[in-house]
Amino acid sequence: PVRPLALDLTDRSSFATYAKALTEEPVEVGLLVNASGFGKFRAVVDTPLEVNLNMVDLNCQAVMALCQLTIPYMPEGGQIINIASVAAFQPIPYIDVYGASKAFVLSFSRALNRELRSRGVGVMALCPFWTRTAFFDRATGDGGQENVVKKYVAMYEPEQLVQRAWRDAKRGKDVSQFGFVARFQTGLTKLLPHSLVM
């Protein structure tokens, strides 16, 4: 059965609501996908503090909390997929807070995957390149730094990422990336100084 829960994941009281829903009746969670998140393409000093705080709350705090609350209800063979970003691998001006929040998701997911090995539960960070979603409408819709996006050469469809993510999760990977451009850019961050890849 499906039971929808409308939650504001930037509000900590939502975690209590979610935890209560898990205990109200016997439940087993075979798959958890943490896909909520947002970014802003603008300088830190030009972004309202409340926006950046909400970004960290949603992109980091909510991912950690939902994982921690859900894990006790996951059977052996269960899977957690946390949506990170190719931005997790390098500092990127004008999306600094977003990129740093996704670096948290990447690091947290990889470490948690190792922790849960004995339970038989997998954790994978999906690190997509630019993807054609409503994310960009919110990120640039109020005069943000659209050129941050325009300078990149590829834009992928969500269906492509889902297929790749599901395949990689079944293979037990802790990180999933789709497309040559994403893997190439990530490779550069391991070889070149940050000053050259930013």
Model feature map: region roles:
Residues 85:
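Residue(s) in the substrate-gating loop at a strand-loop-helix junction
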Residues 118-182:
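SDR active-site lid
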Residues 6-17, 49:
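The beta1-alpha1 cofactor-binding region of Rossmann-like NAD(H)/NADP(H)-dependent oxidoreductases
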Residues 35-40:
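Conserved NAD(P)H cofactor-binding loop of Rossmann-fold oxidoreductase domains
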Residues 43-45, 51-56:
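Substrate-binding pocket helix/loop in short-chain dehydrogenase/reductase
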Residues 47, 91-99, 111:
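Active-site loop-to-helix junction immediately N-terminal to the catalytic Tyr of the SDR YXXXK motif
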